[in-house]
A protein has these predicted regions:
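Mature extracytoplasmic/periplasmic domains
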Residues: 246, 251, 256-311
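Early extracytoplasmic/lumenal segment of secretory-pathway proteins
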Residues: 18-89
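A ligand-binding cleft/hinge motif common to bilobed small-molecule-binding domains
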Residues: 85-89, 212, 217-236, 285
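Extracytoplasmic ligand-binding site segments that recognize negatively charged/polar headgroups
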Residues: 29-40, 74-215
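C-terminal motif of bacterial Sec signal peptides marking the signal peptidase cleavage site
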Residues: 2-4
Length: 341
């Protein structure tokens, strides 16, 4: 849905022009995968600071396809959300305009394009976790490789292939084990993981409820959801600090090439990735900043951090479409799918 944020017109745009900076357009259009609540918070703060009115359209999994389909006649200025692999792909297709935010040099190389075509905004670790009322720390898996052991048959549940984090997780595991043991071994791993999985859920809340009710002991999910269910919903969950690391998805942002409001787009990227912009989202929505400087005022759990799994996202970007098709078509057992009522 198209949502407008803010209608505050003030004189700040004129001030920036007088100060020798580029004058901003009056409005901005954003395509995003983020929640409406989060987008509203960010856009209101941006409007407050710049006077630029923002409209956002929440597109979830269709984001990349929409940007791609409008390449000859862009309707939006900003693509906000989605993983590194997706941004690498669209950059190659010529969908983005490079920008140079003031914080770019502070951002680690893993979280940005070398030529400024896209930037990482939030780190989203995917972790394994278990119900500690059903399993002791000794019995629980220690690493991703343990999930395929015979002892865990029927004790694992996860999201289905509609979940973007699950898709990134499967692609990451195929890439990681291909690099480590060869591609045949990687597919053997994913096949055994499917065999050990009791159910796939099309809803995150249903999956967590199933773990809470003891239908299975082990699952995997983005870290902030696990923490939310542990702390706010009082579920008996224990997070596993995997030996190989957490599959860390980087949520990105980019300015769309030939967009109607390029100056406002560059200013929005400047705002979102800044220390203040990152802290706002960290404290309001538990999203871990990609910019290290923002961590000092972020929630405490973000500062301990989880070691990221060593992954080459350019390899994942090149192969993700084929890998996920193979997983969905040849491996995923559709009879294990559970849909929300």
């Amino acid at each position: 849905s198209l949502t407008a944020c803010g209608d505050k017109k003030d004189e700040k745009k004129d001030d920036t022009a007088k100060n020798g900076k580029t004058e901003l357009e009056d409005s901005l259009v954003i395509y995003s995968t983020h929640s409406e609540e989060m987008l509203e918070t960010i856009c209101d703060a941006f409007t407050e600071e710049t006077g630029v009115e923002v409209e956002f359209i929440n597109l979830k999994g269709e984001l990349a396809d929409r940007v791609r389909s409008e390449k000859e006649n862009p309707q939006a200025d900003i693509m906000f959300g989605g993983d590194t692999a997706t941004y690498m792909l669209l950059q190659e297709e010529g969908c983005y305009e490079p920008t140079t935010p003031s914080w770019a040099d502070e951002l680690a190389d893993d979280y940005k394009d070398a030529k400024g075509y896209w930037y990482g905004t939030y780190k989203t670790p995917v972790v394994m976790f278990y119900n500690k009322e059903l399993m002791s720390a000794e019995e629980a898996p220690k690493d991703w490789s343990d999930l395929v052991k015979e002892e865990y048959q029927g004790k694992i549940i996860s999201r289905d292939s509609l979940s973007s984090s699950m898709r990134s997780t499967i692609a990451a595991l195929v890439s990681f084990y291909s690099e480590k043991d060869g591609e045949d071994a990687a597919w053997d791993y994913v096949t055994k993981l499917n065999a050990n999985t009791k159910n796939y859920y099309n809803s995150g809340s249903m999956m967590f409820q199933a773990i809470g009710k003891g239908e299975a002991a082990i699952s995997m999910a983005v870290l902030d959801n696990v923490i939310d269910n542990r702390d706010n919903n009082k579920m008996p969950l224990e997070i596993i600090d995997a030996t190989s690391g957490a599959i860390t998805i980087t949520d990105c942002i980019a300015a769309i090439k030939d967009a109607p409001h390029p100056n406002a787009a560059a200013e929005f990227i400047e705002f979102v990735g800044s220390k203040e912009g990152e802290e706002l989202v960290a404290n309001s929505f538990n999203r871990m900043p990609a910019l290290d400087a923002a961590l000092e005022n972020a929630p405490e759990w973000m500062q301990t951090g989880y070691e990221p799994m060593k992954l080459d996202w350019s390899v994942i970007s090149a192969n993700q479409t084929d890998w996920l098709e193979k997983w969905e078509t040849d491996i995923l057992d559709a009879s294990k799918a559970i849909a929300a009522e």
